[in-house]
Amino acid sequence: MATRIPKTPSTPPAQKPAGDDGDSVVLERRPQKTAPPQMYQVVMLNDDYTPMEFVIVVLQEYFNKDRETATQIMLKIHLDGRGVCGVYSRDLAATKVNQVMEAAHQAGHPLQCVSEPIA
């Protein structure tokens, strides 16, 4: 007796949707590559009038630095004329600068703080 090979089921022909003339174009969505946001560093500038203790308190209160880290940053500001307090997005950096400037103004100190884009 001969062995029979089973028939493979035939696939039905592809059907076009009604009204499709075969000239359709399929667009594929490519994932967009977004660049990370520009980051800014908040920098405090040295002056001869603002007490060192005030700078330490500002670093602790507005930048969440512990006492030791705040003291190190304060000494860098004092010795180098400027020191980086933190790195943030543009809006958050601007907010931090405003908070520091307002606190200095309220306390009667000429402390200056700026934000700079990181290259």
UniProtKB/Swiss-Prot annotation:
Q: Which GO biological process entries does UniProt record here?
A: protein catabolic process; proteolysis
Entry-linked InterPro entries: ClpS (IPR022935), ClpS_core (IPR003769), Ribosomal_bL12_C/ClpS-like (IPR014719)
Write out the ranges of the annotated region (Disordered): 1-33
Looking up Gene3D superfamilies in the UniProt record yields: 3.30.1390.10
The UniProt entry's sequence similarity note says: Belongs to the ClpS family.
Q: How does it assemble?
A: Binds to the N-terminal domain of the chaperone ClpA.
Q: What does this protein do?
A: Involved in the modulation of the specificity of the ClpAP-mediated ATP-dependent protein degradation.
- Kindly give the PANTHER family that the UniProt entry links to this protein: ATP-DEPENDENT CLP PROTEASE ADAPTER PROTEIN CLPS (PTHR33473:SF19), ATP-DEPENDENT CLP PROTEASE ADAPTER PROTEIN CLPS1, CHLOROPLASTIC (PTHR33473)
Q: What is this protein called?
A: ATP-dependent Clp protease adapter protein ClpS
